[in-house]
């Protein structure tokens, strides 16, 4: 993924700005899905597409891209449940 910011239009008329970059030899993104502050997510290998999340046993967001379409989910570490937040996101 090329460094820079991309804005994705998602279902329900919502948008998400995703800033792609590199830090400490890792592919990262910065997002602000809640409007309360930026979150940095790190790239993790997956079978198909790209996935970014935060290595944590707690709660965190996951940004997954496959075939040009993104999904932002929220992983509740306490309950072990992952819930889609933004779906069908396209640049």
Q: Where would I find each of the regions flagged by the language model?
A:
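Cysteine-centric segments in proteins
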Residues: 1-91
């Amino acid at each position: 993924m090329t460094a820079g910011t991309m804005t994705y239009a998602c279902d329900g008329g919502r948008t998400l700005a995703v800033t792609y970059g590199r830090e400490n030899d890792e592919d990262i993104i910065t997002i602000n899905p809640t409007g309360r502050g930026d979150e940095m997510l790190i790239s993790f290998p997956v079978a198909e597409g790209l996935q970014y999340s935060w290595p944590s046993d707690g709660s965190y967001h996951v940004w997954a891209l496959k075939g040009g379409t993104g999904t932002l989910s929220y992983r509740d570490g306490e309950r072990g449940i992952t819930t889609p937040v933004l779906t069908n996101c396209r640049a």
